[in-house]
């Protein structure tokens, strides 16, 4: 039966901002679904709040709404667009929750919208923990003993019934949010309280512990005809007790017997049929010695399905979208082979390993223990012929300093860390084996299958051989087959990476490339992708006559380097393909659009290091390499890559775009300072130091407070505002460790300055400014954590002219070819340049969506040889609407972290609010970031003295809008002197009843708390942490409070929010 003819227009709900538990995998699946529906001639309406996604590009759907993912707003879009159907399972947990809410309210019935694919009943039967348990038991499938509870009293009763430890799983939440493992009654009550608040239906499931059992996942697909296939099975290296998003995962499963595989395969098909899921679905099992329990089912595209897609080459989201419009598996052609139907089960002749990337370098106070709730921000995937090879390649892909064998622990610490899962457990296993601990001992402490421990032992044993023996060509070949990178071999033999590389080439030990083709080479692949290994035959050939360009991707999503850089990579690829250039990508992130099978002409799933990039260059011999689109990861490779290409006279590949030496000039603060002086561009006074003594001298010369940071960092890592000598000494002790022989930079901190961001494209003759952004938070909050607005709201025309002038001067002086981002600050009408980055920036997608011009695409075309004039870009765009970028902070997923902003970046993702005035746009942005500004209720104020003069106006606006105010004594007395009267609430350290008690009773609707001295900072920290834990909107800077008051004032005037697609906003700009 072909596709349904009655479905002409479909609504897709995206997943919103990148957050812990929901990363870029839904951009990848959403983009694939959009293309899949459009192939069938169906009109697509898309709603998503995240501008950094490919799926929100105006050309991805017929109408793209960048609006808050809020049920009321989605209802207005349905009313306006009148779609025939909605597909819920593409937008992750967010999409499912909104679909369920709209169905319950009767919205679909009211507007005649059909839920396509997986029915709401199936969503309920999987997401509602009690219904799920009943369904499984009805079909004879075993689940852990459990009880669904709606209150703390009910939770207490479960302890007597099931004993401890217990697992807590909230209903309808994301990445296990709000859940955890309770080993005591106190822990159970604490986790249950958190879980009930997080759950959409105020329900958590408390279940018996299956800690230590193996965790196995099956990715299954079903169509309306009841045809089912198993796409992939995966095995978690960590046993049950660690969320699958937090565990290292291998595919296919390695320790299952054939009988166990057949048993779980049959159960998977039985489950997907019983639940009547149509499309892709993920089923998780706990397994122990032939016995199993069904842990959970995700009736949607998920993180695991993104991994399964990349592991097998099977486009799960594409097929799911086609099934949703009535197509059958045997009617859908597999796009990788172009000849086999989607009903063929994929076959793998390689091993993949996924390892998560955690943000603990940014959150030193956060609890690093891994549990059933996620804490990682992203992940890498590596492909090899063996587990050892794919594991070593995965570690190399993480882009972290710490590699296997580089870190050591003493014996008591080793035993503790083996028992407790943390982000370092695999490193600890390596160290324990190196010190002689047996596989059996490690298994008994960690419950990790001895099979995996013995594989790590093989790597340890090989390292011992390399240290002890001469590195002969035979041993070198053996080590390379096992996955050892040249850098590690150099460390083990006391030589350099270059010497190892030369030794390899001399012995003819070169990387070969194998294909991922969904069918273990049984059929010819039309759009294959590749991984490197050390075998005899090579499956890639470099035969075309077309010009070839290799683009370096951004690697795993982490704080400071998010999905924005994948967006830039994909845009660059698209632009070059439009020019008839053959494009190749190297990347290792399974969640992204750039690693989709048909984004580029060739995809190489490899670590982003010099060795692996050179392997591809040697094999493919591209004309050029692009490094400016993949964020700091690819920029860091620019100089070493340029040097290596210069050394290799047999290669004619060059780095395209801005010259790496000019990029380096911008990164090197001293050289950049000299250049700015020559151009007559003001900078904050600064200096650099390599010792404590020098640092104190520089700071005294400039005067405290100063901004200190290491050179060459991403996302403000180890950046701080320092107020006195003691603080500076502590910083020097901590920061020198992360600075790699580079000096510490010390700048005058411009207090109370407005920060400005500019994104521009330069072709070495002309410069086009995409937008000037004004930050809402003042200087001192990392630009990646500040909300910003286009067009600027408070900067004078004279200041804006200075900004434009400096942008042009700097771009031309740095000989930029492509993108440049410049950060500036304005104080008392004078503009200072803080830094320039001649590469893609995290604001490129936001600017492109806001002003309607694709900056990354334009930059790629400039690099390919076009001038800005020939492309028709000469004037800075002037939008008629206001766009606000707001960030999403991950504090709710990281117990223990203080939710305060500073110069080190902490946000994981972003949202965008668009309307015709600042107030409505800001209200939308906060709504989209799940920091909903209240229009009624109580506001608690506790403000440091320095901010109190600005507070009066804010307090008056809030009171005039009908909100009730309360605060601590100092704030109350100050406001009373200025005619604003409110109730006094005790400080936290003065005992109860205080604001935390009120939050617990749901008596506070907004917290405005700016941090100050150490004692109050402790109080403030507890208030802010409680606001996160009790889901109370909170504000920690005065500038955000001023913006919030303006938004609340606008909304109270009864102004309607504008519901328009970005396609419509962009059209208005053309007129």
From Swiss-Prot:
PROSITE patterns attached to this UniProt entry: ATP_GRASP, CPSASE_1, CPSASE_2, MGS
Residues that, per the record, bind Mn(2+) 4: 835, 837
Ranges for region Oligomerization domain: 400-540
Residue positions binding Mn(2+) 1: 284, 296
Location of region: Carbamoyl phosphate synthetic domain: 541-932
Binding site for ATP 1: 129, 169, 175-176, 208, 210, 215, 241-243, 284, 296
Disulfide cysteine pairs (residue numbers): none
Enzyme class: ligase
One Gene Ontology term from the biological process aspect of the record: 'de novo' UMP biosynthetic process
Location of the ATP-grasp domain: 133-325, 673-864
Annotated spans, Carboxyphosphate synthetic domain: 1-399
Binding site for Mn(2+) 2: 296, 298
Domain of life assignment: Archaea
Residues reported to bind Mn(2+) 3: 823, 835
Region annotation (Allosteric domain) ranges: 933-1071
Co-factor requirement: Mg(2+); Mn(2+)
Chain sites annotated for binding ATP 2: 709, 748, 750, 755, 780-783, 823, 835
Ranges for domain MGS-like: 931-1071
Membrane-spanning ranges: none
Residues annotated for Mg(2+) 3 binding in this entry: 823, 835
Cofactor note: Binds 4 Mg(2+) or Mn(2+) ions per subunit.
Binding site for Mg(2+) 4: 835, 837
PANTHER family: CARBAMOYL-PHOSPHATE SYNTHASE [AMMONIA], MITOCHONDRIAL, CARBAMOYLTRANSFERASE FAMILY MEMBER
Domain notes: The large subunit is composed of 2 ATP-grasp domains that are involved in binding the 2 ATP molecules needed for carbamoyl phosphate synthesis. The N-terminal ATP-grasp domain (referred to as the carboxyphosphate synthetic component) catalyzes the ATP-dependent phosphorylation of hydrogencarbonate to carboxyphosphate and the subsequent nucleophilic attack by ammonia to form a carbamate intermediate.
Name the UniProt record assigns to this protein: Carbamoyl phosphate synthase large chain
